[in-house]
Amino acid sequence: MSKVIFALVLVVVLVACINATYVEFEEAYAPVDCKGQCTTPCEPLTACKEKCAESCETSADKKTCRRNCKKADCEPQDKVCDACRMKCHKACRAANCASECPKHEHKSDTCRACMKTNCK
């Protein structure tokens, strides 16, 4: 009876160890979420775009109205948001895709595939 209990305890311990290792592995290789990391700097831009959409609801040409509104009102926030995302993507590229993305080949298919997988 004690051998059966010992075997069950051993199995439970092994399963717990395997699960902990899997969780650590999954967290270590999770893609970098640049959009999520830049939520705070991009909040004013999102609010500005929503404001433009609301103000252009009564316009006859909504598409042109929104484009002009975004260009006139949202451009400063857009630069801050773009700078945050660019910084995040550069850091992610250097950390995860250095061999696939040499200095001047950021548009190659292998580089894009690596960036898509690792830097969302």
From Swiss-Prot:
User: What's its EC?
Assistant: 1.13.-.-
Q: Does the keyword Oxidoreductase apply?
A: yes
Chief localization: cytoplasm
**Outcome of swapping residue 67 to A:** Loss of VO(2+) binding
EC top class, in one word? oxidoreductase
Keywords for this entry? Cytoplasm, Disulfide bond, Metal-binding, Oxidoreductase, Signal
What does the record say mutating residue 89 to A does?
Loss of Co(2+) and Zn(2+) binding and reduced Cu(2+) binding
Q: Which GO terms describe its molecular function?
A: metal ion binding; oxidoreductase activity
Which Pfam families does this entry report, sorted A to Z? Vanabin-2
Instruction: State what this protein does.
Output: Acts as a vanadium reductase which may form an electron transfer cascade in conjunction with NADPH and glutathione through thiol disulfide exchange reactions. Partial cleavage of its disulfide bonds results in the reduction of V(5+) to V(4+). Binds up to 24 V(4+) ions per protein at pH 7.5. Also binds Fe(3+) and Cu(2+) and, to a lesser extent, Co(2+), Zn(2+) and Ni(2+).
Protein name, UniProt field: Vanadium-binding protein 2
Q: Point out the gene that encodes the protein.
A: VANABIN2
